[in-house]
């Protein structure tokens, strides 16, 4: 039986096995899907071992996305823009193909599942790390009016804006540089939720129709989404749908079939 996996450290929390099991039943495909906890300094060896044992593909989670990108022989445009891989495909010719579907998953969840329009909208992204870099390309493809990246270290936000400046209107800066305006979409992409915190955002960023979205899901997303509700945001979503949509795109890469994500999202929401 073909073998697939999610590789990370930690990996115990991953919902990907549950999601792929649901896709497996829905599409009548049979395969094994494993959780592989790779040593922090042993990612390449873990991938080789899995590949040598017949592995066909792997989802990649923290902290290995950049290393997975470097390990690949060929890469998608999104992976090249992100300098990170969210999934690998082990091809018949022995090569490794890297993709990054994080941004695709986000845009699909916002536009298809939540009916949020991104075209000609103002988008504020909080955080300038790897998570932000992974979503910028697909967000810019949606042709927003502008994207503003804000970060505790302004130079990181400026650097990301410079990398993508030819793709659309994009700015970067620190929290004290945020111009007083109401954004259509605010995306939280920092790891502060793991500590039960959220960034020092000022009041006045949220309008009556604003959408706030945390790339994390469950309890980790709660601090930011609670702030958004307190500020009067009409639409507040965590990143559970993004994860499912990401995995649906990976499933299509591996099997050539696009699964129905709605029942899987509903199933996970009922159990989380």
UniProtKB/Swiss-Prot annotation:
Q: Which GO terms describe its molecular function?
A: NADP binding; shikimate 3-dehydrogenase (NADP+) activity
Record field: catalytic activity: shikimate + NADP(+) = 3-dehydroshikimate + NADPH + H(+)
Q: Which Pfam families match?
A: Shikimate_DH, Shikimate_dh_N
Q: Give the family this protein belongs to, as stated in its UniProt record.
A: Belongs to the shikimate dehydrogenase family.
InterPro entries named among the record's database cross-references: Aminoacid_DH-like_N_sf, NAD(P)-bd_dom_sf, Shikimate_DH, Shikimate_DH-bd_N, Shikimate_DH_fam, Shikm_DH/Glu-tRNA_Rdtase
Q: How does it assemble?
A: Homodimer.
Q: What is this protein's function?
A: Involved in the biosynthesis of the chorismate, which leads to the biosynthesis of aromatic amino acids. Catalyzes the reversible NADPH linked reduction of 3-dehydroshikimate (DHSA) to yield shikimate (SA).
One cellular component GO annotation, for this chain's record? cytosol
Functional pathway: Metabolic intermediate biosynthesis; chorismate biosynthesis; chorismate from D-erythrose 4-phosphate and phosphoenolpyruvate: step 4/7
GO BP: any one term: amino acid biosynthetic process
Taxonomic superkingdom: Bacteria
For this protein, the record's PANTHER family field holds: BIFUNCTIONAL 3-DEHYDROQUINATE DEHYDRATASE_SHIKIMATE DEHYDROGENASE, CHLOROPLASTIC, SHIKIMATE DEHYDROGENASE
Name the chain's protein.
Shikimate dehydrogenase (NADP(+))
């Amino acid at each position: 039986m073909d073998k697939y996996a999610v590789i990370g450290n930690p990996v115990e929390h991953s919902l990907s096995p549950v999601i792929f099991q649901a896709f497996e039943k829905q599409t009548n495909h049979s395969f094994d899907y494993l959780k592989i906890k790779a040593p922090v300094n042993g990612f390449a060896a873990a991938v080789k071992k899995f590949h040598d044992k017949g592995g066909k593909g792997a989802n990649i989670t923290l902290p290995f996305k950049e290393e997975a990108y470097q390990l690949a022989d060929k890469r998608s445009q999104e992976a090249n823009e992100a300098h990170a891989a969210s999934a690998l495909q082990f091809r018949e010719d022995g090569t490794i193909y890297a993709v990054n579907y994080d941004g695709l998953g986000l845009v699909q969840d916002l536009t298809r599942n939540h009916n949020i329009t991104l075209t000609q909208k103002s988008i504020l992204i909080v955080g300038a790390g790897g998570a932000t870099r992974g979503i910028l390309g697909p967000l810019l493809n949606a042709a927003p009016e502008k994207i503003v990246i804000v970060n505790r270290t302004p130079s990181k936000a400026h650097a990301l804006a410079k990398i993508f400046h030819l793709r659309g209107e994009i700015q970067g800066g620190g929290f004290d540089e945020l111009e007083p305006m109401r954004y259509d979409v605010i995306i939280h992409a920092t790891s502060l939720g793991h500590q039960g915190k959220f960034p020092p955002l000022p009041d006045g960023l949220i309008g009556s129709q604003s959408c706030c979205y945390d790339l994390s899901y469950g309890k980790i997303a709660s601090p930011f989404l609670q702030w958004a509700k307190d500020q009067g945001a009409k639409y507040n979503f965590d990143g559970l749908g993004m994860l499912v949509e990401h995995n649906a795109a990976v499933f299509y890469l591996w099997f050539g079939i696009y699964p129905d994500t709605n029942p899987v999202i509903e199933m996970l929401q009922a159990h989380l």
